[in-house]
Amino acid sequence: MILREACEFVKDGTHGSYKNVDNGYPLLSAKDINNGVLTIPTNSRKISKIDFDDIYKNYKIKSGDVLITIVGSVGRTAIVRDFIDVAFQRSVGILRPNNKVTSSFLFYILQTTQQQKQLMSKISKSAQGGVYLGELNKIVIPIPPLEEQQRIVSILDRFDRITNDLTAGLPAEIEKRRQQYEYYRDKLLTFKRKGA
């Protein structure tokens, strides 16, 4: 199935230029999507309510939308977990899955080597390479039945939790092993003096 058939819509962020304001709505870009997470920096560029409303007059970002970077570092993904009032620049694609695919499955499938290769093959040869929406829509993705998608997502979510737990716990584990090494090293290299 092509991506367009699995989504209610496939859009990208704004192509317009907007005046920066001190207090307003964050205008985010591809640099704000890393390791499956959308980050909203406190010092992010802000736009006015009028500009924000103009960008999203036809739709709003909502929980469950899948974001994909399509300019610069192409192919990084994140799921919008909570309703947020942010706008995106053209470097971010916004995918709203339809009833044939879950957000989590789409998030994971777009990270696979096969889908990443497809994305890379669609990059335009411009100054800052990117994937146009017409090409993004044509990405072929395997879509199993919903029950199978949920089973796959459940397994991948568990692996993700384990990986993140390991990453978070790794420095402490390394420190424990270093202390253990020092203890046994000292034990092995401490000799009783003759006559003592």
What are these regions (language model features)?
Residues 14-15, 41, 55, 125, ...:
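Short, solvent-exposed loop/turn positions at domain surfaces
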Residues 86-93, 124-145:
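A short glycine-rich beta-alpha junction/loop motif
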Residues 38, 114-116:
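Conserved loop->alpha-helix
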Residues 29, 50-111:
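A short beta-sheet element
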Residues 3, 25, 61, 67, ...:
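Short, structured motif recognition centered on aromatic/hydrophobic residues
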Residues 1-39, 53:
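Low-complexity, Lys/Gly-biased intrinsically disordered segments
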